[in-house]
Amino acid sequence: MTADGNDVTPYAVESDDLDYEKLLARFGADELTDDQRARFPDHPLVNRGLFYAGRDVDDFLTAGEQSIVTGVGPSGPMHLGHAMVFYFARRLQDEFGARVYVPLSDDEKYWFKDQTPAETGDYLRANLRDLLAVGFDPELTRIVVDTRDADVLYPLATAFAGDVRHATLQNVYGEPDNVGQAFYPAVQTAHLLLPQLVHGEHETLVPIAVDQDPHVRVSRDVAAKARYPVGKPGALLMQFLPSLAGPGKMSSSAGVSIRLTDSPDTVREKVRTHAYTGGRASVEEHRAKGGVPAEDVPFQYLSAFFEPDDAELARIEREYRAGDLLSGELKDLAADRITEFLAAHQRRRAALGDVTEALDAFRLTDDERQRARDAVGFGY
C-alpha cells in the first residue's frame, strides 16, 4: 500500500513525511470529528490529534459493552511509543469499564525478523513485565501469547485462514517471503476477533498506529462474511510518534528511542544528544527568531503525552516561539517529565516479582478458551 508514492505496510514505512490525509483516502478510514474527540476520556493523544482517524468509532462510543485490542510484537525492549498506547488503553478501561485484550505475537517475530526463539523469549519476558506494570484490571484484561496460547489461537487462525485469499494477502501486505508470513494475517485476525468469540458479538476498538491498519482491514473483511458470531472491529488510528532523531516512526533501536527501562541519566543523555529540535544556528538567532514547536521533538513528546495541562503546554509553546525558552531548556523540561513517568512505571515493574505468576490472573480461563473454539466450530 502506498501513500503519495511511499510504501506503508505493517512491516515497512518508507517515508519520513507521510501524507496522513492521503493515507485515509487509500485506507478508507474517517478522520475523527470534534464530537468524537469530546466523547473520549480527556487524554492528550486524542485531544491533540495524534489519534486522528478511525473506523466505526461512533459505534464503539455508544456501545454498552466494549472491548479494546492492542498488542505488541516482542522484537526488542518496549519504548515510549508502546507505553503511550497501553496507558491510553488502560484509561479507556478505567473510564468505560472496557475489556482489554493484549496479544503478543512471538510467532510473527520468528517469521518476519532475523531473531532466534531464545532472543524472542527474552524480549517476551521483558515486554510482559512492562505490560503488567501498566496496571490493567486483571478481571477485565486478557494477555495472550501466540505460542503459549496456541490451543485457542491456532484453531481460530485455521478457521479464518480460509477466508483470507491470496489476492488479498498480496494487495494488503505484498508477496510473503515464507509460509509463516502468509499465514500470519489469519493469526492477527484471531487476535482482533478473540474478544467477541469469547464474550459474544459486541463493539471492539483497536487503537493502532496507522501502518498497522491493514491487519484491521483484513479482520473486518473476515467478519463481514458473517460465518462467525462477530461484528467488524473498529479502529482508532494513530500518527507516528517521531523518533528522537526527528520525523519518522519511533523504533526499538538503542539511541533513537527511549526505553521503558532507561535510567534518568540515560533519558537525559538521549534527549540532549539525539533529540531533533530543528533549531537555530545560535542562541542569538533563537532569541531573535524563536523556535519551531512543530519541528521540535521534545515539544512533540510533551504535547502527545507528557504535559496533560493545556494551559501549561500553551505557555511552553508561547515562550519557545518567542525565543524566551531555549532548545536546551526545552530538552531538559521534556527529559524531566519523561523521567517522572518512567520512575513510576519502573517502581511498579520492579514490584511485580515473578512474571509467570503475575501473568496467571490475566490469562484466558479454560471456559473462555472453550467458548472461543466453539464459536468457530473447533470445540471438539
UniProtKB/Swiss-Prot annotation:
Keywords, comma-separated and alphabetical: Aminoacyl-tRNA synthetase, ATP-binding, Cytoplasm, Ligase, Nucleotide-binding, Protein biosynthesis
Motif ('HIGH' region): 74-82
Cellular component aspect of the GO annotation: cytoplasm
Any one Gene Ontology BP term: tryptophanyl-tRNA aminoacylation
Residue ranges of the motif 'KMSKS' region: 249-253
Reactions performed catalytically: tRNA(Trp) + L-tryptophan + ATP = L-tryptophyl-tRNA(Trp) + AMP + diphosphate + H(+)
Keyword flag Nucleotide-binding: yes
Span of the signal peptide: none
Subcellular location: Cytoplasm
One term of GO molecular function: tryptophan-tRNA ligase activity
InterPro entries per the UniProt record, alphabetical: aa-tRNA-synth_I_CS, aa-tRNA-synth_Ic, Rossmann-like_a/b/a_fold, Trp-tRNA-ligase, Tryptophan-tRNA-ligase_arc
Membership in a protein family: Belongs to the class-I aminoacyl-tRNA synthetase family.
NCBIfam families per the UniProt record, alphabetical: PRK12285.1-4, trpS
The protein's name in its UniProt record: Tryptophan--tRNA ligase 2
Provenance organism: Halobacterium salinarum (strain ATCC 700922 / JCM 11081 / NRC-1) (Halobacterium halobium)
Recorded name of the encoding gene: trpS2
